Amino acid sequence: MIIDHLNELTLPLVLDSDCWRGHSIYPNTKMSEQRMVALLQQYGTEKMVVNSAADWGISDPLKVPKTGQAMLAAGFSEAQVEQVLFHNPVDFFAQSGQLDKALVSTPLPIDQRRQWQDNSALRGQEPVIK
């Protein structure tokens, strides 16, 4: 189970439970990147999950990567950022049996030469192929 929309007041109430700890990062309300970083510094990364939204109110779906950048700026390692922003959510959702951890952990090949109905989004740029 995940308890979402946690903050400085509610997170301590969940820490002694077996629940995952969800944090919704929003502009102006709920939780900011800086507040999330402070919680991670104080309580660690175990079972911490960060999410954002693109809903009916003021929102910013890029708050998750912005939180990752704030974590790096605060001295967290890339491995810690990856733990909070990727591995923790994958571990949580994999418990359902509907998500194959190996499948989502395998990088997909990149070939920007591919087109969709003879169209490319490259706009004259050199394609990346990995």
PLM feature spans:
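Histidine/acidic-residue-rich catalytic or RNA/ligand-binding cores of hydrolases
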Residues: L11-S17, K30-Q42, A54-A70, F93-L99
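Short acidic/histidine-rich active-site segments
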Residues: S24, T45-P61, V81
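A generic local structural motif
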Residues: N7-L9, M36-V37, S77-E78
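Structural preference for beta-strand elements that scaffold enzyme active sites
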Residues: M1-I2, D18-G22, K47-V49
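Mid-to-C-terminal alpha-helical segments outside catalytic/metal-binding sites
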Residues: P65-K130
